[in-house]
Regions:
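Glycan-recognition and catalytic cores of secretory/periplasmic carbohydrate-active enzymes
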Residues: 1-264
């Protein structure tokens, strides 16, 4: 970890010769108004910064001053890039928030948010730090404002069910019940008809920044072909399945739901 974590930071900061620039950290500088470059990576790139921050927080149990300084710098950068309402996704901030919350089948917005929350919870639990937690809670509160079963909210979910286990971790760390309620909604809403991914608004220009294009009708790929209580086999992309089935198990555990537990 003493070598890997600093190396990965340099890679994410486009400092390693011979590696294609990712823009991971640079996108936050652009979003904060500190760089005039254009977005040049993938829409999922924010999550790499958050994953690095979680790894760095865990490594800081063993006191590495170089990593601590880099973590502090990253946390400050996130704070500067975050919108006043809590929203924090560099692709959409850089593009003037056009099509925000569109194309969740591919845009990775809630996926990235989930990894921010997980990094914040780890930093709080391991280091007692609240600075990243404040950023994550502000974003989670805004997501709660935008998504849910209530009138006027988006009845949808991300193709990667990463926000769900992250919200359960945030609930268990803070005791704030609305985070569990929102995670419960996401878990139960996935797979209900009409299929969200078939009806959600498309993004007009995100295509060139995607990892790949998904088949429009392949709902099994994202475990969204049926509601979780009607699913009886593990299907789809293994990474997405891991997130979703973990979230479903969390929901069953935290709500003492034996029927869901048996199904999972």
């Amino acid at each position: 970890a003493g070598k890997t974590i600093p190396y990965i930071r340099k890679a994410l900061n486009d400092e390693i010769e011979g590696i294609e620039p990712s823009g991971a950290f640079e996108h936050f500088r652009i979003a904060a108004g500190e760089s005039d470059r254009d977005f040049y990576g993938l829409v999922s790139q924010d999550s790499d910064v958050y994953k690095w921050m979680e790894a760095a927080a865990l490594a800081l149990q063993y006191e590495n001053q170089e990593t601590l300084a880099a973590f502090n710098e990253a946390a400050d950068l996130l704070k500067r890039a975050q919108q006043k309402n809590g929203y924090l996704n560099t692709y959409y901030i850089i593009h003037g928030l056009k099509d925000k919350w569109h194309y969740l089948k591919e845009s990775c917005q809630l996926y990235c948010a989930g990894h921010l929350i997980e990094a914040a919870v780890s930093a709080h639990q391991v280091l007692g730090r609240t600075d990243l937690l404040v950023i994550a809670e502000a974003y989670a509160d805004y997501i709660d404002h935008c998504f849910g079963p209530e009138a006027g909210k988006i009845r949808g979910y991300d193709v990667h069910a990463e926000i769900e286990p992250a919200l359960y971790r945030l609930y268990e760390d803070t005791g704030i019940d609305r985070y569990k309620r929102l995670a419960d909604f996401f878990v139960e809403e996935r797979g209900r008809k009409p299929y969200f991914f078939s009806e959600e608004p498309r993004n007009t220009n995100v295509g060139k920044n995607l990892v790949y294009e998904l088949d429009e009708s392949d709902y099994r790929h994202s475990q969204s072909h049926l509601p979780i209580r009607e699913q009886n086999e593990a299907v789809g992309y293994a990474v997405q399945a891991m997130y979703f089935y973990t979230a479903a198990a969390d929901k069953a555990r935290l709500n003492h739901d034996m029927d869901l537990f048996q199904n999972v």
